[in-house]
Amino acid sequence: VSMVGMFSEATSFNQPLGNWDVSNVTDMRSMFNGNNWTDDDMTFNQDISSWNVSSVTTFQYMFVHNPVFNSDLSSWDVSNASIFIGMFGASNFNQDVSSWDLSSATQLQSMFGGNASFNQDLSDWDISNVTNIADMFAYATTFESDLSGWNTSNVTNISGAFKYAAAFESDLSNWDISNVTSMSYLFAGTNFSPNIASWDVSNITDMERMFRNTTVFNEDISDWNVSNVTNMSLMFMNATGFNQDISDWDVSNVT
């Protein structure tokens, strides 16, 4: 059962739907999303906290570009959902989702990307099956949750995950990124110097603009194995604080 795009760009709709039985719905993609290109202002901000979404497998773009929706979803059972791409992207959603069961999640890219309001505790999220967190918090300028305990062992793409996330300063030293292949733009425009010296970057191929416009970053990453990297373009562009010896890096595969 699908509700894909049901109220997409329905800018005037703001009626109560709290009593709906959505227990058989599997797809809620773009259900209440706005339109970035026309600057349409969505008005939907109703209480749907009691919805039974336990059958939903994808929430992709459900509230993206909806600047007003900010209702409590803390009790939602999202344990069967695998796709959360852009769910709250470019919105102002800022509610507690710390208890969400993300054990089935695989794709979280851009989930809060462009959301300048979101700043909730996500430290206990189980992302052990997630493969993609690209742009997850890009331009989420107030987000500062502790993510040090996240199990990232299955993640392959972290490109832009914290791009211009100005408030973010979590310890990421224990992240397992051994399966990651792309980390372009990862810390671009950030204001902290993460201790990532021990990261296993041996499978990385793309480091484009990774530290671009970082004014603080100056960690010793001299021991990084970058032998598989093919793209380092603009990697340290305008990284005004960086001054470490990386003379021993093997850049023979960079093209």
Language model features: what each stretch is:
Residues 1-255:
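Negatively charged
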